[in-house]
Each structure stands twice: as C-alpha cells, then as structure tokens.
Amino acid sequence: MTVRVAINGFGRIGRNVVRALYESGRRAEITVVAINELADAAGMAHLLKYDTSHGRFAWEVRHEREQLFVGDDVIRILHEQTLADLPWRELGVDVVLDCTGVYGNREHGEAHIAAGAKKVLFSHPGSNDLDATVVFGVNQNQLRAEHRIVSNASCTTNCIIPVIKLLDDAYGIESGTVTTIHSAMNDQQVIDAYHPDLRRTRAASQSIIPVDTKLAAGITRIFPQFNDRFEAIAVRVPTINVTAIDLSVTVKKPIKASEVNQLLQKAAQGAFHGIVDYTESPLVSIDFNHDPHSAIVDGTQTRVSGAHLIKTLVWCDNEWGFANRMLDTTLAMAAVGFRLDT
C-alpha cells in the first residue's frame, strides 16, 4: 500500500520532508499528491531545488501553472487559506502532514479530517488534546487505528527523548536539566526590528539569544513520571542549522562515564540504530548537517560527577533528522490502519 500524503505548509520542514522522501528511496511507500502553500509556485519550486543548508536537490524540479514536477512525479499545488476549503477528499488523502507551525490543536486536526483526510500529523508539539504524540523509536508502537490527530513532537524532543529513555532504563533518572543550543530560526530578525519577545528584536547573526522553550513539557508529555523533575532553557546561536543539547541528569545507580558511553554506543548499533548515532570524532556542528538521525551522542563530551550526575552532549540536524521522522511516523500511522467511524 502506498500512503497518499498531502503537505500543508511548504516551509523549512515541508520542503525537507519532500527532499527526504526522494533521497531515502521511500517513494514506493509514500506519494505526495498535493502541497498547500500561500507562496507562488515559482518560489516553491526554486526553494525546493536550491537550499542554503542542504545544497541542490538531486532531482529535477519544475513547475507548470499549479503543478510541481519532481522528476516524473506530478504534485498538485494549492493556495487555500482556509482548512475547510482543502480538497483532501477529492484527492484521496490518507495523511496530511501539517508543517505550517501555525495549526496544531484538535480543532485544526478535525478541520483537515472534515475536508476528507483520514489522519493528520502535526510537525510540532501541538496542544495536549491530540490523540497521540509520537517520538519515533521510543513510543510509535503505542499508535492505534483510532489515533487520527497526531503530533510528531519537536526536533529537540526527538533528539533528547531516546537518550533520556536509555539513561533512565539503565540507571534510573531522578531529575534533570536540559540546555538547547539551537540554530537561528525564521521567527528571529535579520537586523534589529520589533518583536513581542524583546530578545528576538535583536539581529540573529550577531548574538547568542536566550528564548523560551517548552522542551521540559515535551519531555513530560512522553514520560509523565518526570513531571516537575526536568527543567529546560534554550539559546539561539548564529548558525543556520544543527542543534546541540546539553543534558544533565542525576541517577540512582553509581556510574562511570565510560559505562555511559558504552551503553549509548551499544544502543546506537542495536535497538536504536537509525535513530541514535554515536561518535567520538572531534566534530563541530556543521559536520552533522544533513544527518538523518534524531540524536548523535558526542562521546568525547560525556562527564560523570560524584558517580550520580551524568552530563552528555547530543547533536541533531533539527531540520533533516526531524523531516525523516515525519516520514517514519506517517508510515507508522498508516500501518495501524484507518478507522473512519471514530
């Protein structure tokens, strides 16, 4: 069965989802039938073909009127501003990937379904009333056919949750803190300009900028047992892609740094292969650009203090890794089937 997908929002994640689909060789499993984006077709085709972070797309891309051609594949282009006007029923859409970053609550999901989609996957955490939040590699096996409106969590949640699970299963986490060192995003300013968040009024290329984060809430959504036991802060740095996460946890069992690294390396080679990677090479952020893993543990930065405090550094390509997980979760949602009577 080929899953018929529509993409709502063709920004950073939407375009990377299309690129990842073609580069990963999964076109026999997923076909993109339509993209809804307010920008014009010429701009959509240009930004799919040429990308500052990920380079030129290997596939031929062109557009004619309201059709986007990727190789021999034809994708219908839509410019609908209202979810109710989207022709998902006419197009036989199985799963909508909503990559707008704007929509994300149950009402929005129901609007996609009322328009004819069978299921919806949001590319950000969304509201708490969704049917499920998936971090692929950790909890996708909890998906059921009746889960129609699903969140793929966030790039940072996908990065840190597998590592937290591994450390908790092995040593028992008591509490933790997380610092996200995140590349600049398009909600920041190129030069100083007005923004409701006064820190984000400042030029993104000239400062390390603290921002709010809901990562602690994202952790407890997946692992409710950590409610009030994790805190998170975030800063944006003047790079355009790749994120590092500094994770510190206190654990019940005494441990050595070498044992932590052995655990994480074994997981990367085994149960979490393709989701978690492990390196001890002297790499910097750009070396992880276009890496499809959710998390890459930097073993050179693992530290243990007092036998119970573990500090690790985990990298991720916050665009490419997450786009690949969107595809994984889409297939997992389709694999459990569709119940249209719910």
From Swiss-Prot:
The record marks 182 as: Activates thiol group during catalysis. InterPro entries: E4P_DH_bac, GlycerAld/Erythrose_P_DH, GlycerAld_3-P_DH_AS, GlycerAld_3-P_DH_cat, GlycerAld_3-P_DH_NAD(P)-bd, Glyceraldehyde-3-P_DH_1, NAD(P)-bd_dom_sf. Pathway: Cofactor biosynthesis; pyridoxine 5'-phosphate biosynthesis; pyridoxine 5'-phosphate from D-erythrose 4-phosphate: step 1/5. It catalyses: D-erythrose 4-phosphate + NAD(+) + H2O = 4-phospho-D-erythronate + NADH + 2 H(+). It is found in: Cytoplasm. NAD(+) binds at residues 12-13, 318. It holds the Pfam family Gp_dh_N. Keywords: Cytoplasm, NAD, Oxidoreductase, Pyridoxine biosynthesis. GO terms for molecular function: erythrose-4-phosphate dehydrogenase activity; NAD binding; NADP binding. It comes from the Bacteria. GO terms for biological process: glucose metabolic process; pyridoxal phosphate biosynthetic process; pyridoxine biosynthetic process. GO terms for cellular component: cytoplasm. The active site is at residue 155. Its EC number is 1.2.1.72. SMART domains: Gp_dh_N. Its main location: cytoplasm. Substrate binds at residues 154-156, 200, 213-214, 236. Belongs to the glyceraldehyde-3-phosphate dehydrogenase family. Epd subfamily. HAMAP family: E4P_dehydrog (MF_01640). Homotetramer. Catalyzes the NAD-dependent conversion of D-erythrose 4-phosphate to 4-phosphoerythronate. This is D-erythrose-4-phosphate dehydrogenase. It comes from Salmonella arizonae (strain ATCC BAA-731 / CDC346-86 / RSK2980). The gene is epd.
